[in-house]
Amino acid sequence: MYNLTFSPSLSSSLLSFTQQTPAAIVSSSPPDLVLQQKLRFVVETSPDRWAYVIFWQKMFDDQSDRSYLVWVDGHFCGNKNNNSQENYTTNSIECELMMDGGDDLELFYAASFYGEDRSPRKEVSDESLVWLTGPDELRFSNYERAKEAGFHGVHTLVSIPINNGIIELGSSESIIQNRNFINRVKSIFGSGKTTKHTNQTGSYPKPAVSDHSKSGNQQFGSERKRRRKLETTRVAAATKEKHHPAVLSHVEAEKQRREKLNHRFYALRAIVPKVSRMDKASLLSDAVSYIESLKSKIDDLETEIKKMKMTETDKLDNSSSNTSPSSVEYQVNQKPSKSNRGSDLEVQVKIVGEEAIIRVQTENVNHPTSALMSALMEMDCRVQHANASRLSQVMVQDVVVLVPEGLRSEDRLRTTLVRTLSL
């Protein structure tokens, strides 16, 4: 096992390419190609469309007594069928992400060679082949770099072990495992004489620069300009960080902000049940849809609760209008007392199982609500639901209570309640 570490030695790797045309590369002998040509040869002659290829070299640090992988060289092809630009113009969420981070796939590739503290690390085995296809395999992989790759739009991530490191390839398309392709990559890099580096002091190696003439076709000219622009930007940033600590502090703050934002995206992705794609824009869109569906469910539940309450009230009104032995209205002329003097009391009781529905109608004098609650407490009846409404000078109270076993008779409960309220 060894650490996947990223080397700042970008200047050499960015310039290590030649002006040889793809046709000439195909017809030439792969073992004779220099490292950059080999990387281009692998992706340009493959029937599948790979977005990038990276050569990670195995290194050993005597100080920590550990082996790790370090960036040596790479080649970025991009997504030829990428139609994300159209999506960015039609979706406000994706436009915002585009302005903030640019092309996720290219940013993921560029982050590999910026600096060791700006990219994720993961211990991997130099003898194991990794071929992950589809968002689910990348998302649930134990390979941390695979999760990060899937989050940046990679749908296929391949890590092929060779003699002194690994060859990593990524694509935005789903590519099934191809044994012939794996063997061809191993033969190209296993038989080549790639410069071997040692790192006994813990410093990063610098790959050899291949010579090339100033004349060449336009296909490699645009690649040269893009690579030189990236290198110039990196060198300028490194110089400013060295001479201006304030800039370094700002860069560190920006790095922490992006890490915090990524962690929040990870948390959001964990709670959203269905994610259509692994990029940030799709994740936000899926999260919005999920929240809207939850709001719709809440509205439906609230509507059902209102209907149930209305149905319960209608049943109670119907039961009070029917005269039966189990539902008799008692008109009690209470004696003048301290609690309720000169008021008419009307009590209706309906028992259903262990619960009873009680309606008490009385004059709105001497705090009838408190009197009813006190009476129920004395009777050891637990109140489940209570509702009180005033109509002119009449107070109507509807109460649902749990009835103790000794009072689970409508006549007995009604008589006991009337007697308790009359005291």
Swiss-Prot record:
Signal peptide: none annotated. One of its GO terms (cellular component) is cytoplasm. Keywords: DNA-binding, Nucleus, Transcription, Transcription regulation. It is found in: Nucleus. It comes from the Eukaryota. It holds the Pfam family bHLH-MYC_N. InterPro entries: AIB/MYC-like, bHLH_dom, HLH_DNA-bd_sf, MYC/MYB_N. GO terms for molecular function: DNA binding; DNA-binding transcription factor activity; protein dimerization activity. Residues 318-327 have a biased composition (Low complexity). Residues 245-294 form the bHLH domain. GO terms for biological process: negative regulation of gene expression; regulation of DNA-templated transcription. SUPFAM superfamilies: HLH, helix-loop-helix DNA-binding domain (SSF47459). Residues 192-243, 312-343 are annotated as: Disordered. Residues 328-342 have a biased composition (Polar residues). The keyword Ligase does not apply. Homodimer. PANTHER family: MYC (PTHR11514), TRANSCRIPTION FACTOR BHLH14 (PTHR11514:SF40). This is Transcription factor bHLH14. It comes from Arabidopsis thaliana.
